[in-house]
Structures are given as C-alpha cells and as structure tokens.
C-alpha cells in the first residue's frame, strides 16, 4: 500500500500543477491578446525612504552572505525575526520599532530575498539549507537568550529549527503557519485546505509564476497584501510607501525566482524523525483568523506537537498578522517573552499542551 499511496500522491500533485499552470498560462495569453505587450513590461521600482533609516548589516555564512537589520541594545535578549513569502525583513517593521527599546532586535532577509545572496539552483532552496542558514546565523553572531519569531515560510523553516536545534533558542513565536505534522493532518482531512493551497502547485512551475508576479505593474503582489480576499484588513498598516517597498524588492533582477524556488524544492524536504517531532522550547502561535491560505484548525492541532504551546486567535486579521494587527501581536509577544505576565486578553482563546 505504501508504494501505491506514494504513487497516487505524485500523480495527484503533478495533475494539480498541470491544471493551475495551464490556467495561469491561458490567463496570461488572454492578457496578451487583450492588452498587448504593455501588460508584460517589467518595471524596476526605486527604493523608498521607509527602507533607508535602519541599521543595515551583513554576515557571511558558509555559502551565502545574509542581509539583516538590527535595532536595540547589543546586550539585550535577542528577538530574531524571520519573514515569509513574498516578504522581506521590513514585514517586521512594527516589531522592530516596538521591541528595540528592550531587546536586541534582528530581522533577516532569507536566502534569495532582497540583498541576501541568491543562489541559482532550485536545490539551493531545500529546507535543509534554509534551516542551516538560521543555525549558522545564530552561532556566528553568538546570539544568546534567543526568541525566534517567524511568519509563513519563515515559520516553516523555524518549526524545523526548533525541532532540530532546540538548544539554540529559548522561545518560539509562530505567525499563521501550523506545525508541519499538523498541516499534513489538516491537508489530508480538509478539502477546503487543499483548495486554499492551490498556489503551491502553480509555483512548482518554471517561468510562468515569475511572469505573473512581475507583469501588470506587479498587481499580483498588490492583490496579496491589499486585495479584498487575502489582503491586510487594517489597510492603514500597509501604506502606499510600504507597497512601493515591496515592489522595489521584488522588481530587482532575480527578485522573484529565489523566493519561488522555495516552493519548487518543497517536496524534496527531508523527513523529520518522529522522535524529534515534539518541539521542546516554549511556543506561542499567533493566528489571524481571516487567513485566506491556511485553515485555523492547523493552529489548534499544532498544540499536540509541542511540549508547551499557546495559541492566540486574532480576530479580524489576515494571514499577514504581524502587519495587520501589530499592536495585539506586540502585546502577546511581550507577555510571552516575559513569561510571568503572560495571560490571554479579551475573548481570544488560549490552548496549552500537557506534554
């Protein structure tokens, strides 16, 4: 049965990739017929002022040079923040501003993003390398007392960091991504989650996703953050200048290929040994309950894979929770990092595991 189950998964994945890629190709072809070449003209956007007045640094890892922004006292407890797709360090701007008075705040650009190096091969974006980047970053900078905060793809990576290198971090803050084993449970039992995951299959394809993202003045990127379905609900927290910052980063040559390669190598991720599936550091999961991409059931199911885990549902917030409701996110993070003062706020549910 194992062979046939694996064969079915391969066929199913290939079929969905074909369907979504064909749909995207037909849409782009239609746009070419109706709007002409102008639709596909690529623009490189200037760097806005909002990206300039920060403390930018680089560190040389074994295989890449990584860019990061650092704010706050050098001797403070470390808050290390890891962004998702399609984001970059600036997605943590509200947390950098809030916590810089008490913590050594660091927000990185993951490999392939912004001014961090962009390896050319798809296999260079395997989860093994992504986890290793975080491990090396922590060890080379000799970071101690680390709270690791992560969103989206950053959370996919940091769940693994917490499982494989639990000695490097004290606490883990996860924004809108379930534990990988919890995601598999939700995906297998929920048709709604499988439908929400359509983009994963589209992004497996070569070239077409890049064309779609960079065409039409990057309207696809705008829709992700400002659209009615998936976008940030509290629009005042994502300004025109913020949108320009995103376009500036992802309009650079090669600016979309590296991030998309995360998806292209996703199914080659090494299996996590069962004995390591339980996360040992304390975990806080923050979850915007209007996530267009991930079912909130995954957050609750994640508790069983953690030794000590709390889940805070944030009502009226999108997938981009730390940008959408930064004040609440900051309060929850602050209370979690100062464990003695932690408590749920209002009517937001709290779960705690008993492992």
From Swiss-Prot:
Return one Gene Ontology term, BP aspect.
lipid metabolic process
Query: In what pathway does it function?
Result: Lipid metabolism
The yes or no answer to whether the keyword Transport is present is no
As a miscellaneous remark, the entry gives: Less active when compared to ceeh-1.
Q: What class of enzyme is it?
A: hydrolase
Query: What is the annotated role of this protein in its UniProt record?
Result: Catalyzes the hydrolysis of epoxide-containing fatty acids. Active in vitro against trans-1,3-diphenylpropene oxide (t-DPPO), epoxyeicosatrienoic acids (EETs) including 8,9-EET, 11,12-EET and 14,15-EET and the linoleic acid metabolites 12,13-epoxy-9-octadecenoate (12,13-EpOME) and 9,10-epoxy-12-octadecenoate (9,10-EpOME).
Similarity field: Belongs to the AB hydrolase superfamily. Epoxide hydrolase family.
The AB hydrolase-1 domain, residue ranges: 78-323
Q: Which PANTHER family match?
A: EPOXIDE HYDROLASE
Q: What is this protein called?
A: Epoxide hydrolase 2
Which reaction equation describes what this protein catalyses? an epoxide + H2O = an ethanediol
What is the consequence of disrupting this locus?
A: RNAi knockdown of both ceeh-1 and ceeh-2 results in the accumulation of 9,10-EpOME and 12,13-EpOME.
Q: Which UniProt keyword terms apply here?
A: Hydrolase, Lipid metabolism
Enumerate the Pfam families for this protein: Abhydrolase_1
Residues at the active site:
152 (nucleophile), 263 (proton donor), 319 (proton acceptor)
Q: What is its EC number?
A: 3.3.2.10
Instruction: Provide the GO MF annotations for this entry.
Output: epoxide hydrolase activity; hydrolase activity
């Amino acid at each position: 049965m194992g062979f046939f189950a694996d064969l079915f998964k391969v066929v199913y994945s290939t079929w969905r990739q074909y369907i979504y890629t064909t749909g995207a190709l037909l849409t782009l072809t239609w746009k070419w017929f109706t709007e002409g070449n102008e639709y596909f003209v690529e623009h490189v956007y200037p760097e806005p002022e909002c990206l300039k007045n920060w403390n930018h640094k680089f560190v040389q890892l074994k295989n890449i040079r990584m860019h990061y922004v650092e704010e706050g006292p050098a001797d403070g407890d470390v808050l290390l923040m890891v962004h998702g797709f399609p984001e970059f360090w600036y997605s943590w701007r509200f947390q950098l501003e809030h916590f810089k008075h008490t913590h050594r705040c660091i927000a990185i650009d993951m490999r392939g993003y912004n001014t961090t190096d962009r390896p050319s091969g798809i296999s260079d974006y395997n989860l093994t390398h992504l986890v290793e980047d975080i491990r090396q970053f922590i060890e080379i900078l000799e970071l101690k007392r680390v709270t690791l905060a992560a969103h989206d793809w950053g959370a996919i990576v940091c769940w693994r960091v917490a499982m494989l290198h639990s000695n490097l971090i004290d606490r883990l803050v996860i924004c809108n991504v379930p534990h990988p084993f919890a995601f598999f449970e939700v995906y297998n039992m929920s048709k709604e989650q499988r439908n929400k995951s359509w983009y994963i299959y589209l992004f497996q394809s070569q070239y077409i996703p890049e064309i779609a993202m960079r065409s039409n003045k990057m309207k696809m990127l705008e829709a992700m953050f400002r659209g009615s379905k998936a976008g940030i609900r509290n629009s005042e927290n994502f300004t025109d200048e913020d949108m320009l910052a995103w376009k500036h980063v992802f309009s650079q040559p090669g600016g979309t290929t590296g991030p998309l390669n995360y998806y292209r190598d996703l199914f080659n991720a090494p299996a996590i040994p069962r004995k390591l599936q339980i996360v040992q550091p304390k975990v806080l999961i923050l979850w915007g309950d209007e996530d267009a991409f991930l079912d909130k059931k995954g957050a609750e199911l994640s508790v069983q894979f953690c030794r000590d885990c709390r889940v805070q549902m944030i009502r009226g917030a999108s997938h981009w929770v730390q940008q959408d409701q930064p004040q609440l996110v900051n309060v929850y993070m602050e209370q979690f990092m100062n464990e003695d003062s932690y408590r749920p706020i209002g009517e937001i549910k709290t779960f705690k595991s008993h492992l």
